[in-house]
Amino acid sequence: DSSQYGSKCSLGEPSCFAVESESLLDYTPSDQAVFNEEAFKENVLKGLAFVAENDRFLSLGVKPTRPEPGYGYIQLGDAEGDNLYNVQSFTEKPERDFAKIFVDSGEFYWNTGIFISNVKHLRESFSRILPAVLRGFDESYRTFDVETENAYMKQNFPSYPNISVDYAILEKSDNVSVLKCDFGWLTSAPGTVSMRQCKERG
């Protein structure tokens, strides 16, 4: 489906690795709804500043308002700074009973699927965890025009695993942090409560 295509495409996006290693990346899935843009901007800027100084992935977590089995959850570990925590664990789409336990514990935040990283760390992680994704990538490339990028994707796309970056990289890394956010968030991903349903519920 389209969400899988987007995930698969993003895994092999050569332009992400063609920029300078000091560059920073904000990965935001297209199925997101953000209701407080100013708060979102502040959180992203704080996250970019964090990964600029740390070779870590930073997930944006949102405090759950209900036990939603269609969402992923991030368990908070040790505090690392102002609203920053080490990630203790990821849980994807738990049963409703477990989702309720997560919400009641106060230790779990919704996983928005949004993460921030510096390009150097992202590339190193792909090389270690999913080397096939970078196969065929010529490190000498520093600029991809549309024609070159399309040719690269045509050659390499079929070999990419059909998996999101969350599953492929973040959940297999031991250096992931989470930023507690409050910017009003929903996703239209399959299996979740729709925006219309949420409005109807008040």
Give names to the regions the model predicted.
Residues D1-A79, R123-I129:
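Conserved beta-loop-beta/alpha segment of the NTase-like Rossmann-fold superfamily
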